[in-house]
Amino acid sequence: MNPFNPDAYCGIYCGACSIAMHGETGRADGFAACLGSVPTEELICGGCKSDTVYAGCSTCSLRHCAREKGVAHCVDCADYPCKMYSRWQSVAKFLPHSREAVSGLAAIKRDGADLWLAVQKKRWSCPDCGTPFSWYAPECHKCGHKLVSETYKIYGWRKLLCRFVLPAAYRKGKAKSSTA
């Protein structure tokens, strides 16, 4: 697997991705737990800008578009915000971490990707011990520091949605990769 790249085309910080964290630590947070039907050995990802992408993300239309156009981020495209990005946002809003994409792109455009990545790395690291944590981790797996105010929760209808939509995205990605 190539080195992990936490940068994403859409403005999400892949460094706090539950699937990437699971691949690194073997621990499943609330988000990764929604993927119960996905084989554990497939919960790995090098980030959406890598060649080793989790099957559920491999079919992302934004990723394919940005790669085709040769842009580092959607905000670098002359068509941004386009219909594709707006459609993705209307669906992505159901997953709390995805809501940060637009503000992430604004920060990338304003401050540059390197500064944005540094800020995100600090934000998604435990304030007590510096260990990285995922969007949905309730506490630091190393020191036990409570992270509830700094992370997202999946509960109620979102948890139900998560249990169906995420495995469906995985199956779609696997089906597409097996026919390629």
Language model regions located:
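Hydrophobic scaffolds flanking metal-cofactor catalytic centers in soluble metalloenzymes
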Residues: 1-111, 122
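Basic/polar N-terminal segments that are highly enriched at the extreme N-terminus
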Residues: 1-4, 176-180
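Contiguous alpha-helical segments
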Residues: 36, 115, 119, 177-179
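Short cysteine-rich clusters marking metal-coordination/redox-active sites
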Residues: 45, 74, 126-129, 140-143
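Short Cys/His-rich micro-motifs in 6-15 aa windows
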Residues: 65, 82, 144-154
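Short Cys/His-rich zinc-binding micro-motifs
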Residues: 66, 126-133
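Short metal-binding segments enriched for Cys and/or His
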Residues: 85-87, 152-162, 166-177
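Short, C-terminally biased terminal segments at protein or domain edges
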Residues: 104-114, 127, 154, 163
